[in-house]
Amino acid sequence: MKTLYSLRRFYHVETLFNGTLALTGRDQETTGFAWWAGNARLINLSGKLLGAHVAHAGLIVFWAGAMNLFEVAHFVPEKPMYEQGLILLPHLATLGWGVGPGGEVIDTFPYFVSGVLHLISSAVLGFGGIYHALLGPETLEESFPFFGYVWKDRNKMTTILGIHLILLGIGSFLLVFKAFYFGGIYDTWAPGGGDVRKITNFTLSPSILFGYLLKSPFGGEGWIVSVDDLEDIIGGHVWLGSICILGGIWHILTKPFAWARRALVWSGEAYLSYSLGALAVFGFIACCFVWFNNTAYPSEFYGPTGPEASQAQAFTFLVRDQRLGANVGSAQGPTGLGKYLMRSPTGEVIFGGETMRFWDLRAPWLEPLRGPNGLDLSRLKKDIQPWQERRSAEYMTHAPLGSLNSVGGVATEINAVNYVSPRSWLATSHFVLGFFLFVGHLWHAGRARAAAAGFEKGIDRDFEPVLSMTPLN
């Protein structure tokens, strides 16, 4: 098969220490990449690259299954999931498996089944990966032209894009079917403190759903992260799945327009950079969602959000001091503002103290106490239920903040209490991974553009400064 790049471009990359270490079609001389450059050696070997991707999928699914079973084996039903460092079981619980009213786990068998199914799937993928990496054809173009490709073939590339979009659309509809047909999903807003329910009346209004995209990302607006009812979330997945599937069909049936052929770089490394950029965006959005959103990520499973823990603390002390005789409506704090209650910039009654910064929090345990103008004083005096007190005290002591002292007015625990919220883990990991993916996007985009423009040189090894330096030994 014709090599798409001049091999001279790659000779600056690295020199093998062991010149005898050669795999046909995968050594430095034929590919221009040394062994440590990984899949770059397979740029023009579609069969072997397929093996690498299938094996990688097998590793991912194996982790999911093994970690799932590990969490099931360590799970203690009497403790909340977020106290046990779990990150997979909360996702399964959110999908409505094994939980009942209030997010209580009533059956762990579905979690076990999930783990075993993923392990079995990973074995199939692992076998496929090994087969295509070692035994299958090196290139697919001759034997299986439908699965073969040339990176420069714009029409084939958009067809592959279309297939991917259809698969993403099907994935989106799987959530819709789970919520609508197969038992429903967990709704933290269900009356009485959350329950599993079928989502039958989902929102399909484009003005509501696309309105989220047009909202400001700041404050109480919160862009798409501000979604707070499952009808909107499932309706959004109906729209998203439909757009992905229709877009996929469009990309399969059409060829790229002239402006797209001119504007985009059409090479393997360019596609890698586009993909990394998309994944970086996904990572940053997921970070914000798991940190701020308590509807898609219910606090019963993931622990409270930062604002939620802070508001829960203010509520807990309001309840305590009100019982001790404080007049919470008029008590003044050290700054002259209300100690327990004050007014927001737009006039609503909100909690006073440092938690004022989180006044736009919405949480299922707090909303019943609001009236048309914010917190309702008469409800705070007469209508607080024991479950609201219990939940706020629990959330107050489980803030997703890794600190030894008070942060934002929230009392965090001493170091002996070994607690890190899954929200902290998931938000931090997705931000860091998203950032690295973004750097990778910039790196590969720069290389792809340079290669397309024909000026990528690399380091000239003949005049490298280290060659003129004294040997270390």
Curated annotation (Swiss-Prot):
Location (main, coarse): plastid
Presence of the UniProt keyword Metal-binding in the record: yes
Subcellular localization: Plastid, Chloroplast thylakoid membrane
Residues making up the propeptide: 1-14
InterPro entries according to UniProt: PS_antenna-like (IPR000932), PS_II_antenna-like_sf (IPR036001), PSII_PsbC (IPR005869), PSII_PsbC_sf (IPR044900)
GO process annotations (BP): photosynthetic electron transport in photosystem II
TM regions (residue ranges): 69-93, 134-155, 178-200, 255-275, 291-312, 447-471
Cofactor note: Binds multiple chlorophylls and provides some of the ligands for the Ca-4Mn-5O cluster of the oxygen-evolving complex. It may also provide a ligand for a Cl- that is required for oxygen evolution. PSII binds additional chlorophylls, carotenoids and specific lipids.
Bilayer topology term: Multi-pass membrane protein
Name of the protein in its database record: Photosystem II CP43 reaction center protein
Organism expressing this protein natively: Pisum sativum (Garden pea)
Gene name per UniProt: psbC
